[in-house]
């Protein structure tokens, strides 16, 4: 029994120890939580006040004082009531003189001026100019109002310094937004420097443009001085005259390329196988050489440049390029003439006589056609053909170059002396042989097409005549066909 009591006593003691330890732990947890809360509160109190947002900086604390200048009593009372409803402090004045007295009073503290433009004694624009010319009052925003909204008046008020222009009748929502002008003016004058930055930018831009213009003028003057100075300034040893001749040479070459239009056909070859364009090019080469010689006699440095330009290798290169250009022009003429003949084949002939004359002329051209050196592959038709009215301009253009054939002989040009006359005679023969084959094929196709068209038109014409005869045989009244009636039968029926 004693042993059992001892055991039960030990169990009770152990239970007490366990419960006591759990209670101590709970107290410790509560103490730690309180300590952490106290630390957080102390940290929040120790935070600097700079992070706190002050709305007083952005929102107006007090109501704005508005000075209303209006000579009409009813309008003045209405606008005053509207301003008071918008939580403004209003000082209404019927005259400009009284308004100026209030503005000069330091105790008034006017934040905004709302004035009428047209007034009997002193106008609102006079008050505006007077406020803008004052040292301290020019910071007060002035708003003009009027029943006239002409562009001239609005521009005059805004150019004199007005912040806004309101047109009567004035609405309440317009008056609610008047505080924004005061806020902008205070914000700009508080040190943000937005307006001053704009003015600085505007003033800097014209200075930069003037500087660029001055630099451009200085560079132009420097170029002119260098152009007027002697040839010793050039590093290559060439004179200004020599460079001028070289530039004139390149300019003339570009001018000759630009003056020949790509849409026009080149000149037709003459009987001697020379081209007018080639002669003109040769004449230009001669003129350029003469100018080089004249300039070369003037100065020693010019002589060096002219000698370089008159080297035989350069002349041979130029001659080769000119001959190649002439060959290309000849190829273009052949291709274009083939295109023109195809276009001409589509032109319809209206009468049988024209068709017959065309056939006769085509047969004659087959038999009597002579292919000469340098001739253009163009269909030769008589004046009675349908193509005569299209070829008048071409024939007149051909006659003009043939008058000056002798002046453009190949023996006069230095290019012909260097290259010989073989280059100008061999190429047209090859081109003409290929053009003759094309011409024969084209002529056969034209004949076939015209015969088919003739048969088709004849069938249509026969059909038309037969139907016309049948229609004439049928009598009709007012466009409607009727049956024939015998006069004898109708007379017997009447009796």
Curated annotation (Swiss-Prot):
GO terms for cellular component: nucleus. GO terms for biological process: cytokinin-activated signaling pathway; phosphorelay signal transduction system; rhythmic process. Keywords: Biological rhythms, Coiled coil, Nucleus, Phosphoprotein, Transcription, Transcription regulation, Two-component regulatory system. Gene3D superfamilies: 3.40.50.2300. Residues 65-183 form the Response regulatory domain. Residues 442-484 form the CCT domain. Belongs to the ARR-like family. This is Two-component response regulator-like APRR3.
């Amino acid at each position: 029994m004693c042993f059992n009591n001892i055991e039960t006593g030990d169990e009770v003691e152990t239970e007490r120890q366990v419960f006591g330890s759990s209670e101590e732990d709970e107290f410790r947890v509560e103490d730690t939580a309180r300590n952490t809360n106290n630390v957080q509160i102390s940290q929040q109190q120790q935070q600097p006040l700079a992070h706190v947002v002050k709305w007083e900086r952005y929102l107006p604390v007090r109501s704005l004082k508005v000075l209303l200048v209006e000579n009409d009593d009813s309008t003045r009372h209405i606008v005053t009531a509207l301003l008071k409803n918008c939580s403004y402090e209003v000082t209404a004045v019927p005259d400009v003189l009284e308004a100026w007295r209030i503005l000069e009073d330091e105790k008034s503290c006017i934040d905004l001026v709302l004035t009428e433009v047209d007034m009997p004694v002193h106008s609102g624009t006079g008050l505006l100019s007077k406020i803008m010319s004052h040292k301290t009052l020019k910071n007060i925003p002035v708003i003009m109002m009027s029943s006239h909204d002409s562009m001239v008046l609005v521009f005059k008020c805004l150019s004199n310094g007005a912040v806004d222009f309101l047109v009567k009748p004035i609405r309440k929502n317009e008056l609610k937004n008047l505080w924004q002008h005061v806020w902008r003016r205070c914000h700009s004058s508080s040190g943000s420097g937005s307006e001053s930055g704009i003015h600085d930018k505007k003033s800097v831009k014209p200075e930069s443009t003037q500087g660029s213009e001055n630099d451009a003028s200085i560079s132009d003057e420097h170029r002119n001085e260098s152009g007027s100075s002697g040839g010793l300034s050039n590093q290559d040893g060439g004179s200004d005259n020599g460079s001028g001749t070289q530039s004139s040479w390149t300019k003339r070459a570009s001018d000759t390329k630009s003056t020949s239009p790509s849409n026009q056909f080149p000149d037709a070859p003459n009987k001697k196988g020379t081209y007018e364009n080639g002669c003109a090019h040769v004449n230009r080469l001669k003129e350029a050489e003469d100018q080089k010689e004249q300039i070369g006699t003037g100065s020693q440095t010019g002589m060096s440049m002219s000698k370089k330009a008159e080297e035989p290798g350069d002349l041979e290169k130029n001659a080769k390029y000119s001959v190649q250009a002439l060959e290309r022009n000849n190829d273009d003429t052949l291709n274009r003439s083939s295109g023109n003949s195809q276009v001409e084949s589509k032109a319809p002939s209206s009468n049988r006589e024209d068709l017959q004359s065309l056939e006769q002329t085509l047969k004659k051209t087959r038999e009597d056609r002579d292919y000469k050196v340098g001739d253009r592959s163009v269909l030769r038709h008589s004046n009675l053909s349908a193509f005569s009215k299209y070829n008048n301009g071409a024939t007149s253009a051909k006659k003009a170059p043939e008058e000056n054939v002798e002046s453009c002989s190949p023996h006069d040009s230095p290019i012909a002396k260097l290259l010989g006359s073989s280059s100008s005679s061999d190429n047209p023969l090859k081109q003409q042989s290929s053009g003759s084959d094309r011409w024969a094929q084209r002529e056969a196709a034209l004949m076939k097409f015209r015969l088919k068209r003739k048969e088709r038109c004849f069938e249509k014409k026969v059909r038309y005549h037969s139907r016309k005869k049948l229609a004439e045989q049928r009598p009709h009244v007012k466009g409607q066909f009727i049956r024939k009636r015998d006069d004898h039968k109708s007379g017997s029926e009447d009796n």
